[in-house]
């Protein structure tokens, strides 16, 4: 999905549907969670890398940043019990209510902690829908790894049972945080996510997708959940992506939801059209190989020059117009798929 340069009308519609992230009240600064703090908002150190290469190559500049996240521990968790946990990464509209009112509650009901990141608020951004360059995609991933490190230090969280779950733009981080070069370059020492979940994910095609090949991804399993009527990020692209990731050696499954559009986890069933929103055309052949840092045409495997990338983008990838629509029955089906996956992967 190409999220860049939504026009004002589309941005306004987007914000009406998604809400916007902002600086939260009563945020407690923390360097770690060793004291075992309870539920609430916490701010902690992260970074704002400019590109994915800056994530991979630790010698490159990574400007210091502060991020924040809201912690939801399962109710009545015994002090001597370590729970599994999930880091939730929002999309272009920032943190939206259903992340906490639906997803965090669903996870808590299964005895799983939830840590909902606000990537945008501490960086002074409400939404990147109109201009994705306001916050780099690499910053999302840096924040997810920072959250992993915080959770791993909590005495009631099992550091080996922490998953990441991303929504739309956040799905890009959910997938890329499983890429071996990114783990080696940016994950906290000795840590990695135990599972990766991408809901109506961006980045299944185009330059934000990772070339799936042996050695590109870690062995930790992936789950994609996607609507078959999603016209913002296409099911066919995510299905192909999951199949190629599996073929390269990382277990990846996809659950398709019939009659379901983008942003199906919203409470509101009202369909909102975003006629000026930019996106990636179905079947865009571009991808990025993290093992040799080259743009490629996935049809041929050919490495591409910057000029060729621009040419293909213009001809086969850049497009406008999409829609979003809440669907509670689809959301419940997605919730079941997520919990079933976590039961298998995190032993909950």
Give the ranges of each region predicted by the language model:
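Primarily recognizes the serine-hydrolase "nucleophile elbow" in alpha/beta-hydrolase
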Residues: 136-218, 232, 236
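Short beta-strand/loop motif that positions the catalytic acidic residue
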Residues: 218, 224-226
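N-terminal cap/lid segment of alpha/beta-hydrolase-fold proteins
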Residues: 27-81
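C-terminal catalytic histidine-bearing segment of alpha/beta-hydrolase fold enzymes
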Residues: 251-348
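Serine-hydrolase catalytic machinery in alpha/beta-hydrolase-like enzymes
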Residues: 56-67, 76, 82-153, 315-323
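Acidic beta-to-alpha connecting loop that harbors the catalytic carboxylate
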Residues: 47-48, 228-230, 258-261
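Bacterial N-terminal signal peptides that target proteins for export
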Residues: 1-10
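Bacterial N-terminal signal peptides
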Residues: 11-21
């Amino acid at each position: 999905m190409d999220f860049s340069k939504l026009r004002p009308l589309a941005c306004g519609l987007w914000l009406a549907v998604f809400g916007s992230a902002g600086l939260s009240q009563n945020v407690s600064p923390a360097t770690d969670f060793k004291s075992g703090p309870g539920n609430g908002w916490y701010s902690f150190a992260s970074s704002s890398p400019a590109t994915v290469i800056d994530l991979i190559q630790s010698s490159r500049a990574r400007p210091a940043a502060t991020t924040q996240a809201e912690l939801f521990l399962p109710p009545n968790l015994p002090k001597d019990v370590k729970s599994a946990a999930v880091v939730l990464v929002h999309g272009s509209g920032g943190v939206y209510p259903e992340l906490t009112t639906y997803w965090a509650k669903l996870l808590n009901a299964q005895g799983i902690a939830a840590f909902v990141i606000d990537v945008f608020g501490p960086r002074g951004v409400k939404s990147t829908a109109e201009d994705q360059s306001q916050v780099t995609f690499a910053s999302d991933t840096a924040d997810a790894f920072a959250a992993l490190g915080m959770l791993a230090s909590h005495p009631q969280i099992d550091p080996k049972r922490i998953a990441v779950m991303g929504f739309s733009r956040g799905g890009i981080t959910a997938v890329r945080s499983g890429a071996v070069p990114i783990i080696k370059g940016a994950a906290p020492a000795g840590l990695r996510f135990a599972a990766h979940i991408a809901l109506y994910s961006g980045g299944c095609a185009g330059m934000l997708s990772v070339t799936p090949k042996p050695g590109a991804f870690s062995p930790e399993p992936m789950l994609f959940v996607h609507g078959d009527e999603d016209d913002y990020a296409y099911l066919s692209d995510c299905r192909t992506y999951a199949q190629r990731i599996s073929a390269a050696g990382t277990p990846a499954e996809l659950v398709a939801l019939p009659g379901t559009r983008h942003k199906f986890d919203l409470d509101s069933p009202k369909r909102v059209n975003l006629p000026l929103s930019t996106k990636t055309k179905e079947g865009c052949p571009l991808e990025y190989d993290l093992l040799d840092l080259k743009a490629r045409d996935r049809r041929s495997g050919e490495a591409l020059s910057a000029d060729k990338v621009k040419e293909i983008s213009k001809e086969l990838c850049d497009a406008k117009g999409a829609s979003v629509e809440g669907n509670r029955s689809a959301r419940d089906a997605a919730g079941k798929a997520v919990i079933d996956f976590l039961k298998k992967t995190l032993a909950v």
